[in-house]
């Protein structure tokens, strides 16, 4: 944890420091301009290795950990004395006065809540759904809420609409625990957590105990996370549209830097009206930067778990694991690693790729690699593509299918072609692709501890990855 005591302005400064520390330590701002006594936390999930330590598993097998938990949900339990409701504001609500809202760049549309977990209860099944949606603050008690096509929250809203109701009671929870964040950060439709699946049960399985919830103070039918830092109670108003940026244009101007790496477009979306703000004593405001690894890690892990679950059903003998590279931006692509045992396993990498592409609707690219590849290292994956890929027989372009709009192929309707690259060596010719194995040495014995440390500091992550492996 990196603690910063100098004053930090939520306008541009906090986001700029968060961006500059991307992939590094978690950062706690202790002196937030305009909000005495308030703290802001970011980059908690910026490191995959750190997430793996939280879960007590090897980083390569985080997908298995999540997939197993999804099949053994632990139901949430209701409590009456929730820490997240220790302080409640139900009159004279002013979001900007209570919450240290951030603006990331000068080109942004305004101040945006990026870490608000929307908890909604399905009015038909009673299952809890959790999802993140960017929320530009419009007034003292109103924000936009951007809900992409295909999101389960949109389907829940449609159920309310079908019942003749224009308002969807929800809570927006900031600063939920790691298990809740991992269970609810899937970006869109994925087979592991289909519509009607209770995602708080998933979170309970991840943390080994039920998630605690409390009835909202001002919204019947809504529940707050009892352990959240901050909660905005309110309702989504389906009868009220508002533009995310002041000109009122739809899909023309930039909104803020998004997970795909570009400025996200501003749209006309539903509004969210805040009817109460509750929070812990001395709460900390969690601020994930959408473009940072913190967000793409949280988006990517549920996608990995969904692909892992699908692929192990297709061929548990050959499939090893899977991972989203940082450049794949959370859920736009996946690397799957296989280990064929005999000539009869040849071709299963292709079946696994088809399963991976179907397990998550946003998935646009899949690359299959052999068991000797470090799937977390983009250089090693690219080496496999270059040295083992056969672009005549090992490249597939699908017909038009559902993909993310963040892909270059993706249209406004979410249509595009999916891409698969077989970057595995032919099993029958595997001896041609044997890597050299050198003897292990302790550089400190040869160079001294200080010089050895200097060498390691200069080596790239790719070289460190290669030297750490014994084929």
Which residue ranges define each predicted feature?
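Extended, highly charged
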Residues: 1-271, 275-471
